[in-house]
Structure formats: C-alpha cells, structure tokens
Amino acid sequence: VIIITGKGSCFCAGYDLSYDNSKDLPYHASKTDGFWPRHVVEGAFKIWDLSTPVIAEVHGYCLAGGTELAASCDLVYCSDDAELGYPVVRSMSPPDNQFFPWLLGMRNAMEMMLTGETITGKQAAENGFANKSFSAEILSKEVEKIASKVAKVPSDIQAINKRSIHRQMEIMGMRDGITAGTELQALAMHSNSTKEHLKELSSGLKEALDKR
C-alpha cells in the first residue's frame, strides 16, 4: 500500500506555477492544443491503473491540482479542517481532470464549479470526495491503521479487488468522461476571460489571484 501526503502545512496547493511548460512532459502527450489537460489525465490514470492500493492523506490546503491528485487515489482521508477546492474555475477553466461529478454527484459538483468555493475535510467526507475525516492530531495515526488493514490482504488478491471497482466505474463511463473533459478545459483556454487572466498573472501572481 502507498500513502501520499504533503510535507509541511498542506497536502498540495496546486500545480507548480514556476514550472517551464516548454520542457518535455513526464508522460506522452502530443503538444497540440489541449496537451496539458491530456497530460494531467494521463498522469492521474497512472495512479488509477496501479495494482497497489494508493491512499491520500489530506491536511491543510488541497486545491486545484492537489484535488486532482487526491481524487486519483483509491482511498482519501482528510483532516476535519482541510480545505479542498478548485478556485481556478473563477478565472480560467474547469479542472483538467473532471472527477467532481463522479465523486460528489451533480449538485455538489455544480456548486463547486459555479462558485469556486472550498469545502472542509469533514464536508468532503460527507459529500463523497473522501472516505472519512479525522481531527488533524490523529489523522496520520488513523491512516496508518487503515493502511495496515489494507496491507494484510495478499497483493494479488488486492489487485483484483481494486480492479473490480474500477471496472464498474469504467463501464459507467468514468474514464471516457474524464478523458473527454480535457477538450472543455482546452476550449476554456481560448476564452477572452482566460486570456486576460493570463496577462494579469504575468504582471503579478498575488494581485491576479486576489482579484478573483
């Protein structure tokens, strides 16, 4: 079993905005229009397709790309006071990885997409994004207990157990739906509002983010 968590005060506050996108990507994605969301989705399904169970231990901020990382994991456990959301919808685009409707249901997903507001770790567990939430003080200990239970099952059986759930989700269209969603993210990057926001970002990150 694999546990993914953040070092320091948060799980993940999003993509590294200082990264040079002109560099080769770690996964194959042709650099045509929409290459970035395709690359993100491909990376998410690398975790999805692992035979080993993957657990996300979420504390502090879990925003934008951080929510995509957590959503790709098999089990998600949050601190009660964690903050999860995709604030980028206020200024640029929907998520690269369209997992919200699948995990949260239509109404909860729509509210997050139209407002850009965050939810707490406790709400994430209530809404279906996470399995459970715990107080921050005991989160790691509780996740270790769960990981120990998962690890007791033989790995060959666990691989089939994991795949049995994924097979049903894929029959319902989850993989195809998330992959198709990359086209909407790519389309959003051509909107006038997004182009204007990118100009604002180049002038000053904090000022641009504070505006939205």
Residue ranges and their predicted role:
Residues 11, 116-121, 141, 145-148, ...:
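C-terminal alpha-helix plus adjacent terminal tail
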Residues 1-5:
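Conserved CoA-thioester-binding segment of acyl-CoA-metabolizing enzymes
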Residues 43-44, 181:
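Alpha-helical packing segments of well-folded alpha/beta enzyme cores
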Residues 34-41, 137-140, 175:
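Non-membrane alpha-helical structural segments and their capping/turn regions in soluble enzymes
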